[in-house]
């Protein structure tokens, strides 16, 4: 953060949110390259191979392209066929991707500085483990066990392109950046496929920045609810909501509810809501009755549609009863499990038994969806029977083995919080046998003959690294009794969603 601060102290552009001059600064391309442009498609996947993309990248080409925009009244990048127009040996689609990610990096830097300055002196700045995806689950274990219902909401996409531009207008002050931003969106984006689940020419980094900016817009309703509730406690991100329109909406909400809808205001006095947003979805957990949950659903849908221009379909808001329904959350199936307990109480000479029930959050692995994802990537068939990975037979034996071991360890690491490890062992078995079949196919042998020739030591690499570490942490008796395999373990170093989660 201090490094970015030093780069952007050249004038008052940072204080006034003037971003357009940064496109023509020499050092900004070095900064953008270091900030992550060279790692645009770095392999964070556990199933797929690296795309040879970063070798084509050149920050000089991006700057050259921006400068050439002013040489003609029409840009050098035609829009009819992005894949067949070449400039310096690259397609027009490639150039748009480079410009879009550069725009995202330049816009991210001032906001990162402002966000970091707002947390100065606060304890949150040192809590790096909050970045982990698994850090959400211990929170849910403590909170969801006291709730009855959950609203599972699929976050909608903006119905019009101009809404995204209007969202940035309250944060970016100079018109030049907005015009450049609007031009890129209108000219090069296929808005019929504007979905995070579909293949789009939008760069992922560029898309996620726009998407999160827009989501923060209609998440502002929760600031109003927070003022009406003594229980709603959330991290304050004031820097993301510094705009006049937002405060105007909050005041308007308050006036409308107080004057015209006193009955509705009673619903908001003590809602006791916990809100989590993740992977294009969000959940709202509460202790309300089914009638009140339907009211919440109705009010949220209408507020987002009427005030934030978001086409929010009511069928994308599901009401789940935690004691009966499973909640699909970050690749886990979560539900409440009732554990009966018998407590023996003794008073003087009399003793009696008390039946008690303990509510516990149960997190399970969605084995059917994971097997479907493995089948789609040719690790097994739809029934879960392992098959050989034919496309990897050209690699060396060590490379094939390392690929399968890496996939197995990542899956084991991510799903270590499952309360039932049987499904996890089944997934690891599929990958282990798929590895053996792939090696046997490469050497034109059968699985039995291949294992007999090399021995069972070939598969010892599949022993996960966390098993070896946990054996040193826990007592030997505890580890030897196999109780460790029934314990849920949440890790604080998981920063990316597993590829098997909602994989299409």
Curated annotation (Swiss-Prot):
Gene Ontology terms describing biological process: mRNA processing; RNA splicing; tRNA processing
Annotated keywords: Chloroplast, mRNA processing, Plastid, RNA-binding, tRNA processing
Main localisation: plastid
Subcellular location(s) of the protein: Plastid, Chloroplast
GO molecular function, one term: RNA binding
Taxonomy, superkingdom: Eukaryota
Electron transport recorded as keyword: no
GO cellular component, one term: chloroplast
Job description of the protein: Usually encoded in the trnK tRNA gene intron. Probably assists in splicing its own and other chloroplast group II introns.
Family listed: Belongs to the intron maturase 2 family. MatK subfamily.
Protein name: Maturase K
Species this protein is from: Barbarea vulgaris
